[in-house]
Structure formats: structure tokens, C-alpha cells
UniProtKB/Swiss-Prot annotation:
Alphabetized InterPro entries for the sequence: 3'-5'_exonuclease_dom (IPR002562), 3-5_Exonuclease_domain (IPR051132), RNaseH-like_sf (IPR012337), RNaseH_sf (IPR036397)
Region (Disordered): 27-92
Annotated Polar residues bias: 31-43
Localization annotation: Nucleus
Pfam family, one: DNA_pol_A_exo1
Chain segments annotated as coiled-coil in the UniProt record: none
Protein name: 3'-5' exonuclease
Chain positions recorded as Mg(2+) 2 binding sites: D140
Chain's gene name: WRNexo
Residue span, 3'-5' exonuclease domain: 118-290
SMART domains listed in its UniProt record: 35EXOc
Amino acid sequence: MDKYLIKMPVKLNSIEVTEKKISAKEERVKQTNAAKKQIATNNNKRKNQDTPEMIKDKENAESENPPKRRSSRVTRSMRSMAEDGPASPEKEIPKKLPFIKYSGAIKYFTESQEIAASADEVMQWVEKQINMDVVPMAFDMEWPFSFQTGPGKSSVIQICVDERCCYVYQLSKLNKIPAALAALINHPKVRLHGVNIKADFRKLERDFPEMSAEPLIEKCVDLGVWCNQVCETGGRWSLERLANFIAKKAMDKSKKVRMSKWHVIPLDENQLMYAAIDVYIGQVIYREIEQRETVKLKNEAEFKEQNGDAAFKLVKGLGENFLSKINEVTI
């Protein structure tokens, strides 16, 4: 008889129905999240597999066909970008550049008498340069820094007058700057240059009061300011970015070395190389900007002679790099 019985569906109570609905909903949420996670994983895999050329093609495609909702109206920020034109070179992300390799001599001194003798030797070399009105000399300083106590006393002065040799003077044992080094730095024929060099002179004066900052500030050259004048760029420069833009070289500005104990004697090989490269590349940058300035002044003089002052002012008023545009303009 049992096999002929028909089993009627059992009516579930409301609590059981609710629990089943909740379980079904949670299951759907889990499936949805799992699907999203899988899609994200696949996208990341594809992104990581993209070659630089593929990434560049995607960026070009996006720039050529921007989303409509972005291009439907011009915002204030977009107007300012259009008015300002392309980004300044100092703000552009540099391409992969070769690192600076310095193979010249590094002359390192820690004793007052040794520093004085070396500075006197450099000064004699400067005075022998009879064909030069000024002798450019890259100048930089290093000191220890602590987040608890702040900057320490000036510990290292490094200079470079010839790219084949850099001088590193450690001041840790000194209570006073040797007279010969002070005379070299203040020599009327020496043109000190660097990045943010005025701040270095002010710190040097604070740490060694016998060194007056103002005379040095009056005759020094800030490479960033000079670059803006010659290359018609804008903004503030770091030495690293100037090396990228002017010398087309990358610098290894290791934080470990930069924040190291510059007051401890002796300096290690990494510290010596770091100090030497800073002034070496500074000297390279100076000579390159000097060469560009010579070419620029020559081009401007020729343009004025051919087209007159009015045309020259018109071209300068375009707000574009004169060196790159001068041959394209027809008056």
C-alpha cells in the first residue's frame, strides 16, 4: 500500500523560508564577488604582460579618443592646462637614462694642513688659467641629518674645477676653515656654482662664522636659475633633474648614502663617490648650459640683424623656446 501513497508537499513555516532566502542571497553575493575577483586578477595579469610599446599605444588611444563625459565640457583646470601649454621639462618624467659613471680622481683630505695645501694647489692652478676671465668651480656641501635633532654641522665641502679630478674636504676635525680654502672659495676669478647654492653658503656661515655668506652669494651661479634663463624653462630644479634634462644622465641619489654619517672619519667609498659625482656632474651641467647660452646669444644676434628688434620681440613674445623656434619663423 505504501508505494501508492502520494506524498503531499509540506508547508514550511515562515522562519525556514526566511533562512533559505538569506542563504540563497549570500550564495549569490559570494558568486558575484568571486567573479569580480577573477576579472580583476585577469586584468592585472594582462596589465603585467603588456610591453612598454603596448602601454604607450593604449595611452595614445585614450588621449586621441577620450571619454565623452570628460570632453563634454571644459573645466577651469582644463582651460588652465591649455593656456599653460605643455609641461615644463623639469616636470616631465624622464625616460630611462644611463647612470653617471665617474672614473676621475678623488682627492680626499681630513687634516687642516692637508686641506690647506690642497686648496693652495687648486688656487695656483686657477691663477695659471690666463686665457679665462672666470674659472667655474662646482661647489657642494654635506652634513649629517637626524629627524630627532635636525641638521648637523657642515661636515664636507667638495669642489671640482676640472672634470678629471674632484676634491673632498672633511671638516669634522676643524674648528675653523683653513685660510687657503677660504681664499680659494673667495678668489675673484673663481665662479662658484651649484643647485640651491646660496643656502649652502648661509649654512657654512652659521657653522663657521669666519666665512661670510653675502660676498659668495653675490658672485655665485645657481644652475637651476641659469637653466631657466637660457633654456626658457620654469620652476625649481634639483641637481638630479638638471642632470636628466641637461646632461641626459641619471643620478643614483641613494637615501642611505645621502642620510649617512658625514661627520664620521673616514668616509667610505660610497660616500666619496656620492660627493664627487655631485660636483662632477655640476661642472658638466655648467659647461653645457654655457655652451647653449653662447649658441642662443649668437642666434638672437643674427636674427636681430636680419629681421630687426620688432620681429625679435614678436618671436620672444610667443612664449616658446627661442632656440628651437628661431629657424621656423618667417617674418
